[in-house]
Amino acid sequence: MKIRASIRKICEKCRLICRRRRIIVICSNPRHKQRQG
């Protein structure tokens, strides 16, 4: 899980989701997991 100020989709399978007032990226590739912090 990478924590970044600005997150973006890395590939086509990445999905942006809002959870508990946080924006996270979920992907089939575990390296693409991100969270805004």
Curated annotation (Swiss-Prot):
Main location: plastid
GO BP terms: translation
Domain of life of the native organism: Eukaryota
GO MF annotation: an example: structural constituent of ribosome
Keyword Cell membrane applies: no
Annotated localization: Plastid
Keywords associated with the record: Plastid, Ribonucleoprotein, Ribosomal protein
A Gene Ontology term for the protein's cellular component: ribosome
Keyword Transport: no
Database matches in Pfam families: Ribosomal_L36
InterPro entries in the cross-refs: Ribosomal_bL36, Ribosomal_bL36_sp
Similarity section: Belongs to the bacterial ribosomal protein bL36 family.
NCBIfam families reported for this sequence: rpmJ_bact (TIGR01022)
Name of this chain's protein: Large ribosomal subunit protein bL36c
Organism the protein comes from: Epifagus virginiana
Organism phylogeny: Eukaryota, Viridiplantae, Streptophyta, Embryophyta, Tracheophyta
